[in-house]
Amino acid sequence: MSAWAALLLLWGLSLSPVTEQATFFDPRPSLWAEAGSPLAPWADVTLTCQSPLPTQEFQLLKDGVGQEPVHLESPAHEHRFPLGPVTSTTRGLYRCSYKGNNDWISPSNLVEVTGAEPLPAPSISTSPVSWITPGLNTTLLCLSGLRGVTFLLRLEGEDQFLEVAEAPEATQATFPVHRAGNYSCSYRTHAAGTPSEPSATVTIEELDPPPAPTLTVDRESAKVLRPGSSASLTCVAPLSGVDFQLRRGAEEQLVPRASTSPDRVFFRLSALAAGDGSGYTCRYRLRSELAAWSRDSAPAELVLSDGTLPAPELSAEPAILSPTPGALVQLRCRAPRAGVRFALVRKDAGGRQVQRVLSPAGPEAQFELRGVSAVDSGNYSCVYVDTSPPFAGSKPSATLELRVDGPLPRPQLRALWTGALTPGRDAVLRCEAEVPDVSFLLLRAGEEEPLAVAWSTHGPADLVLTSVGPQHAGTYSCRYRTGGPRSLLSELSDPVELRVAGS
């Protein structure tokens, strides 16, 4: 897929408390089916492909295989593909695409044409989050491939449909949610019609107060700072359109802020004093009279040291500084006395970064590196800082060079389906590694160019092949690449076979 065909995120920088809105442009087309008669939805079917940009070329994909493209005399935003009565030759899973800037754009949503009843299940999703709290308008979006239907919302445990919404000119309906529970939706083409298959179930929780945001120290600030330095902290909420607050202990920090997205804010701390390193949290509040502040984030810590105290001693266990991959390494930082905070610092191609901060009861901190790999290689040192005035800090310890040779741990790849995949469906493969902050790559056997890429800070990532057809059958593996200046590439995972039904 070309860069032009990728999703475009166009953000504007704001120095206000939070950016009011962001512009999101998705170049993918939309596809829907229209029935000639609601009483007989499969008797005369037309598929309509609508593009957000004008184009002269449309293409229908059936069961993962592209059909003959349609060339128009003049640019248009939509094209209609008449199927007529649904038969064995027209039954299938459809998507559409269009050509923009000489490249075919990523395919549309899936429309299932079965020719049978009950009608295919719709999809259901939550907006903006899957929980409710005072002051928040949570909704459920029910989406069908068939236009002009009546949508039905069901709450688990209720005998009747909870709500009914007609959508004569649309393929979706939005339902407000006021109760926690398990929801699904279906649709029908006329009042006496049989409801479609139900959608998957989504769970709505009631959370009061709202869940905590995340607070992180920006990379340039995640080092040992001198008093008088500046630092940046980023607070990210699980939804947009909220007011943020930075606190240290119970006291609000009225500092400059900026935002590039309505779900986050950057706090800028200037002229930091020696004792300004610990205890930062953030929270958010919906813009409603009923809204309460969220739970506090986990605390973020800065390390400020004036270098006036004696250097600590840093030692390793085992003493061998070329451990085997997968081993446990313990780095011990010892100060002349107790009552201090310790920071472990690593220097690599990306510079000096604080790895961890500990506040033990005694004069020694023990930093554990579990399952070490090549990404843990670097020059380690440590410092300590007084936790009481005047908050003096130490010189850095002597450096220990830790070198872990050998390949990175291999990732694991598994398919999120069983058996042969139905043509036209998406193939979702989950790649998982023990290393954080990596890009996962999906590769087909014998090919070097990745077919899908996904970034993950922690945990697995789902790699998706859209609208698979017989041409996608084969063997797949994944690998990952670490971020930063010292980029490392893992070995391939064990292979997973993708079988496509009928091929």
Curated annotation (Swiss-Prot):
Ranges of residues in domain Ig-like V-type: 27-115, 117-204, 208-305, 307-405, 406-501
Gene3D superfamilies: Immunoglobulins
PANTHER family documented for this protein: MHC CLASS I NK CELL RECEPTOR, OSTEOCLAST-ASSOCIATED IMMUNOGLOBULIN-LIKE RECEPTOR
Keyword field contains Signal: yes
Main location: secreted
Tissue: Plasma.
Protein name: Alpha-1B-glycoprotein
A Gene Ontology term for the protein's cellular component: plasma membrane
Protein's cellular compartments: Secreted
Biological process (GO), any one: cell surface receptor signaling pathway
Transmembrane domains' residue ranges: none
Glycosylation site residues: N137, N182, N379
Alphabetical keyword list: Disulfide bond, Glycoprotein, Immunoglobulin domain, Repeat, Secreted, Signal
N-terminal signal peptide: 1-21
Disulfide-bond pairs as recorded: C49-C96, C142-C185, C235-C282, C333-C382, C431-C478
Pfam family, one: ig
Assembly mode: Interacts with CRISP3.
